[in-house]
Amino acid sequence: MTGKTLMADKLAVMADSPADYQRLGLSPTTIAPWEDGARTDDSAGTYEWWYFDAHLADGAKVVVSFINTMDLAEPKSLAPVLRLNLDLPDGRHFEKLVHYQPSEWSAAKDHADVRLGTNRFTGDLHQYRIQATAEEISIDATLTGEVPPWRPSTGYMLFGADRSMEFAWLPSVPQGAVTASYSINGEKHETTGVGYHDHNWGNVGLMKVVHDWYWARGQAGPYTVIASYVTASEKFGFEPIPIFMLARNNVLVGDDPAKVTFEREGIYTDQKTGKPVAATTRYTYRDGENRHVVSFTRTHDLSANRMIDSVKGVKRIAARLMHFDGAYLRFVGDLQISRYRSGELVETYKEDAIWELMYFGHAR
């Protein structure tokens, strides 16, 4: 059986053929500002979000997302949400979800310019400004790209025999410099840091096509990494889709998923969600005599939430009847990046990192 036949038989793939690029109007070598503009029309069945996170020099960690609907299982209508998480070095932790009317949401198509009430997320693939307020928390951050915009092939994961179901991803700023001011009840802080921005969208409920994914990004020494391992749902054969990008001194080292091996170690059952969690996830990238080993090792959880707990009323009853037990876990721990040449360790670096496990399916 040929490689082409094998690929055709797969029910979950990353779109990467010349025909895919042509159909989607994308270049295999460059990324255009419109790609970070609105990619859906906010219609029923679609979803989209713009995401930013930063590790700040004062020890704080911030996450901001502008989301057109939180209903990723069965998106039916525009129901915009601002998500703002802030972790402070003194141990205080804030998780905010603020819901807005559809009329308060807008997103430009030619570049990133998303407005949600008085909040704004705007940029041009190189420099972004994120302004967000949720109750007593507010942040105003500027993100300037250091690692160039990147996407895994076209960025589109396609599902089904006809490949009509899509989930797409654009890491517009794999790593950038951040200047930020944030306040808690008027207590203002100004600092700098390292940040990241990406953009997701799709036309099918994620729980229909994805069983689970690990997603991570981080920086250690001269290295920047984005690493994800997506497992398609049972209907699509639990097909794995590895995603990997490694840069050194802001220059791409490698991003060929065929050269990546993914491993889970120290698997335990999370008590709150009942999901199997790997204490360590490891991505090994082999290219000729060079081998890069990227490991994420958990020290504690930032959050561990059952998705049904955020669903209310009739939707909650329906979710229970469907035995839906999806979960979202976010971890803090150590990122270690080591480079070997001909089997000999050349260099190794370690740094703090944040990563996540999104688990839509039943534990397996």
Predicted segments, located by residue:
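Structured soluble/peripheral alpha/beta segments that form catalytic or ligand/cofactor-binding pockets
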Residues: 1-364
